[in-house]
Amino acid sequence: MNTFCHSTIAARIETAAAAIILFLTTLTSCGRSSSPEPLDQWNDGTSTLHTADPVIAEGRKLFNDKEYQNFRLTGEALTQPGSEAGLLFHTDGESGYEVIFRNGDIDGTRKSGSLASVRNLYRSLAKDGEWFDFEITVRGQNIIVCINGTEVVCYTEPGYPYRTEEHARQLLSQGSIALQGIHGEVSFRNLAIERLA
C-alpha cells in the first residue's frame, strides 16, 4: 500500500475541511460587526435608568444615548387592554421611524409591528396580557419587523419617499433608540441590539 498517497489525500481532506469551516464561520457572521448587547441604558431627561426591562407609561419617553445606523433589535413586549407604546429608531426625538406596540381586537387602530404611517397593520399577531417576541432589523434602506417570528413589515425606503408635512423627517439615517408611552402601560424585557455592517 502506498502511504504517500494516503497521507497526501488525508492532507487534502484536512485542508478542505478547514476551508469549509472557515467558509461556514464567515457565512454565519455575514453582515455582523458585533454580537448582541443589552439595550439597558435609558435617559428620561432628568435621570438615567439602567435596565433591559423598562416599563413605559403614557406620556413617558426614554432615550438610549448611543447612535445606531444598521442594527438588529430584539426583545419581548407585554401590552394590556388599551395600552400602546412606540419604539423609535434613527431618532433625535423628532425624526426617524416608529414601530407600534398595541394588541387587541380589530377596531381600526394600528397594531403591534406597524411601521407608523408607512405600513399600518390592523390585525394583531399577539394578545394582551401575554409576552410576545419582536425583532426590528434595519440595514441600508430596508426595515424588517417581525412579531412572534412572523415577518409583518418589509419596507424599502425609496430615494424620494412621499411624506406628509407631519412626517417629513421620517427618514432613514442614523440616530438613537427611544421608547414612548402613548396609552396605558407597556412592558419590555430582554432588549438587546446588534450592530450590523
Locate each region found by the language model:
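Carbohydrate-interacting regions of secretory-pathway proteins
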Residues: 30-197
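Intrinsically disordered, low-complexity serine/threonine-rich segments
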Residues: 7-10, 26, 32
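Bacterial N-terminal signal peptides that target proteins for export
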Residues: 3-17
